[in-house]
Amino acid sequence: GLPICGETCFTGKCYTPGCTCSYPICKKN
């Protein structure tokens, strides 16, 4: 599957549903 939580979260927020910020990268919740 494709990584859906790979965005960076320097602002402390993830914009992908079901993801949480594991600074500095969003990870699956």
Curated annotation (Swiss-Prot):
There is a cross-link at G1-N29 (Cyclopeptide (Gly-Asn)). The keyword Disulfide bond applies. This is a cyclic peptide. InterPro entries: Cyclotide, Cyclotide_moebius_CS, Cyclotide_sf. Disulfide bonds join C5-C19, C9-C21, C14-C26. GO terms for biological process: defense response. Keywords: Disulfide bond, Plant defense. Belongs to the cyclotide family. Moebius subfamily. Probably participates in a plant defense mechanism. The presence of a 'disulfide through disulfide knot' structurally defines this protein as a knottin. This is Cyclotide mden-B. It comes from Melicytus dentatus. The lineage of its organism: Eukaryota, Viridiplantae, Streptophyta, Embryophyta, Tracheophyta.
